[in-house]
């Protein structure tokens, strides 16, 4: 039996913030000879994405409970029980040595199923505030890790696994020193875009004129509207794209990023070594604010809560950052990153499997 490869089941779903870090760890361990399967849901992004990475995926039926009506909440215990039973059957067949919970609804019943079978449960929390599922699973987990300090009182801070092409970018000093011309502003609202960025940045561009050049990811279906907004502001020269497929190339081009502060975005910007102006999504637990705070504290970023994200405030901030200031901020961002996060998570998975 000692010659058999170790088996890992990754539990992650719903959003890229959960799925992409899980894929990074999965590939790292597969390169070491591990056999990996995935536990997800059939109606979320992992259903299409994970098989494209050469990983087999099993599905359970589960969805979130937040914002659901009374009827759905009353049915929740039965739904969770059924999902637990499905996950347990899948694990009894695959027999993983360890499971890795990266977040999403699937982690709850999946983690419980593993625990009930005596399989070690390793958790990774990507956000600065722990999600409901991970808070609950932390009580039964073998190992708990966090990307940012503060999500759990005693968990190791290991960072977020990020894409290798971002990690491979030249360091800020190499990349940014000697740059001249307009400040290059990369605007990223996530794949769905961010209306506040789409509405505000064209007006900011009008105030800043030829001191900046902007590359703006508008999000799905918004490209034409945003292009018209720039043209209407007398700034048609700026580049607007619906999606940016090669984010590493975009980071390499940029001097500064204006964006939301999802966990993966913050970690990628730190790893790339870029200054940022963060506009956290307004959520009741302020998750994105807490994600961005370590970089603001490090002097690598500025946070604008959405009500403060005005044309004048943004234009004033961007115009106040010289190239020297931006280089200093970029170096601070890189210094605050944890570039070996993938290895750290993978090492904890290996340790739990051997225990």
From Swiss-Prot:
<dbReference type="GO" id="GO:0030259">
    <property type="term" value="P:lipid glycosylation"/>
</dbReference>
<dbReference type="InterPro" id="IPR007235">
    <property type="entry name" value="Glyco_trans_28_C"/>
</dbReference>
<protein>
    <recommendedName>
        <fullName>UDP-N-acetylglucosamine--N-acetylmuramyl-(pentapeptide) pyrophosphoryl-undecaprenol N-acetylglucosamine transferase</fullName>
        <ecNumber>2.4.1.227</ecNumber>
    </recommendedName>
</protein>
<dbReference type="GO" id="GO:0071555">
    <property type="term" value="P:cell wall organization"/>
</dbReference>
<dbReference type="GO" id="GO:0051301">
    <property type="term" value="P:cell division"/>
</dbReference>
<comment type="similarity">
    <text>Belongs to the glycosyltransferase 28 family. MurG subfamily.</text>
</comment>
<keyword id="KW-0808">Transferase</keyword>
<feature type="binding site">
    <location>
        <position position="288"/>
    </location>
    <ligand>
        <name>UDP-N-acetyl-alpha-D-glucosamine</name>
    </ligand>
</feature>
<keyword id="KW-0472">Membrane</keyword>
<dbReference type="GO" id="GO:0009252">
    <property type="term" value="P:peptidoglycan biosynthetic process"/>
</dbReference>
<feature type="binding site">
    <location>
        <position position="127"/>
    </location>
    <ligand>
        <name>UDP-N-acetyl-alpha-D-glucosamine</name>
    </ligand>
</feature>
<keyword id="KW-0133">Cell shape</keyword>
<keyword id="KW-0961">Cell wall biogenesis/degradation</keyword>
<dbReference type="GO" id="GO:0051991">
    <property type="term" value="F:UDP-N-acetyl-D-glucosamine:N-acetylmuramoyl-L-alanyl-D-glutamyl-meso-2,6-diaminopimelyl-D-alanyl-D-alanine-diphosphoundecaprenol 4-beta-N-acetylglucosaminlytransferase activity"/>
</dbReference>
<dbReference type="InterPro" id="IPR006009">
    <property type="entry name" value="GlcNAc_MurG"/>
</dbReference>
<keyword id="KW-0132">Cell division</keyword>
<dbReference type="GO" id="GO:0050511">
    <property type="term" value="F:undecaprenyldiphospho-muramoylpentapeptide beta-N-acetylglucosaminyltransferase activity"/>
</dbReference>
<feature type="binding site">
    <location>
        <position position="244"/>
    </location>
    <ligand>
        <name>UDP-N-acetyl-alpha-D-glucosamine</name>
    </ligand>
</feature>
<feature type="binding site">
    <location>
        <position position="163"/>
    </location>
    <ligand>
        <name>UDP-N-acetyl-alpha-D-glucosamine</name>
    </ligand>
</feature>
<dbReference type="GO" id="GO:0005886">
    <property type="term" value="C:plasma membrane"/>
</dbReference>
<keyword id="KW-1003">Cell membrane</keyword>
<keyword id="KW-0131">Cell cycle</keyword>
<keyword id="KW-0997">Cell inner membrane</keyword>
<feature type="binding site">
    <location>
        <begin position="15"/>
        <end position="17"/>
    </location>
    <ligand>
        <name>UDP-N-acetyl-alpha-D-glucosamine</name>
    </ligand>
</feature>
<dbReference type="Pfam" id="PF03033">
    <property type="entry name" value="Glyco_transf_28"/>
</dbReference>
<comment type="pathway">
    <text>Cell wall biogenesis; peptidoglycan biosynthesis.</text>
</comment>
<dbReference type="Pfam" id="PF04101">
    <property type="entry name" value="Glyco_tran_28_C"/>
</dbReference>
<keyword id="KW-0573">Peptidoglycan synthesis</keyword>
<dbReference type="GO" id="GO:0008360">
    <property type="term" value="P:regulation of cell shape"/>
</dbReference>
<feature type="binding site">
    <location>
        <begin position="263"/>
        <end position="268"/>
    </location>
    <ligand>
        <name>UDP-N-acetyl-alpha-D-glucosamine</name>
    </ligand>
</feature>
<dbReference type="GO" id="GO:0005975">
    <property type="term" value="P:carbohydrate metabolic process"/>
</dbReference>
<dbReference type="InterPro" id="IPR004276">
    <property type="entry name" value="GlycoTrans_28_N"/>
</dbReference>
<comment type="function">
    <text>Cell wall formation. Catalyzes the transfer of a GlcNAc subunit on undecaprenyl-pyrophosphoryl-MurNAc-pentapeptide (lipid intermediate I) to form undecaprenyl-pyrophosphoryl-MurNAc-(pentapeptide)GlcNAc (lipid intermediate II).</text>
</comment>
<keyword id="KW-0328">Glycosyltransferase</keyword>
<feature type="binding site">
    <location>
        <position position="191"/>
    </location>
    <ligand>
        <name>UDP-N-acetyl-alpha-D-glucosamine</name>
    </ligand>
</feature>
């Amino acid at each position: 039996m000692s010659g058999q490869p170790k088996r890992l089941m990754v539990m992650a779903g719903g959003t890229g913030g959960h799925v992409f870090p899980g894929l990074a760890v999965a590939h790292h361990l597969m390169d070491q000879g591990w056999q990996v399967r995935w536990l997800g849901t059939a109606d979320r992004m992992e259903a299409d994405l994970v098989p494209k990475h050469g990983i087999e995926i099993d599905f359970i039926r589960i969805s979130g409970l937040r914002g659901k009506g009374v009827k759905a909440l009353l049915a929740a215990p039965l739904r969770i029980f059924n999902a637990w039973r499905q996950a347990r059957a899948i694990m009894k067949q695959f027999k993983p040595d360890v499971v890795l919970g990266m977040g999403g609804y699937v982690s709850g019943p999946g983690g419980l199923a593993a625990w009930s079978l005596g399989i070690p449960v390793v958790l990774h929390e990507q956000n600065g505030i722990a999600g409901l599922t991970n808070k609950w699973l932390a009580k039964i987990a073998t190992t708990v890790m966090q990307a940012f300090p503060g999500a759990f009182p005693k968990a190791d801070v290991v960072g977020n696994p990020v894409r290798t092409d971002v990690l491979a970018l030249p360091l800020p000093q190499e990349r940014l020193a000697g740059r001249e011309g307009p400040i290059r502003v990369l605007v990223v609202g996530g794949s769905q875009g961010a209306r506040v960025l789409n509405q505000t940045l064209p007006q900011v561009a009008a105030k800043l004129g030829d001191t900046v050049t902007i590359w703006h990811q508008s999000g799905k279906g918004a490209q034409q509207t945003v292009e018209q907004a720039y043209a209407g502001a007398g700034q048609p020269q700026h580049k607007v794209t619906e999606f940016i497929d090669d984010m590493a190339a975009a980071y390499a081009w940029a001097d500064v990023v204006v964006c939301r502060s999802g966990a993966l975005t913050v970690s990628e910007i730190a790893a790339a070594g870029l200054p940022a102006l963060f506009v956290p999504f307004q959520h009741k637990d302020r998750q994105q604010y807490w994600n961005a705070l370590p970089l603001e504290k490090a002097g690598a970023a500025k946070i604008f809560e959405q009500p403060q994200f005005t044309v004048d405030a943004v234009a004033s901030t961007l115009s106040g950052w010289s190239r020297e200031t931006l280089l200093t901020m970029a170096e601070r961002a890189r210094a605050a990153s944890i570039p070996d996060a993938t290895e750290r998570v993978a090492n904890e998975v290996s340790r739990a499997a051997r225990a």
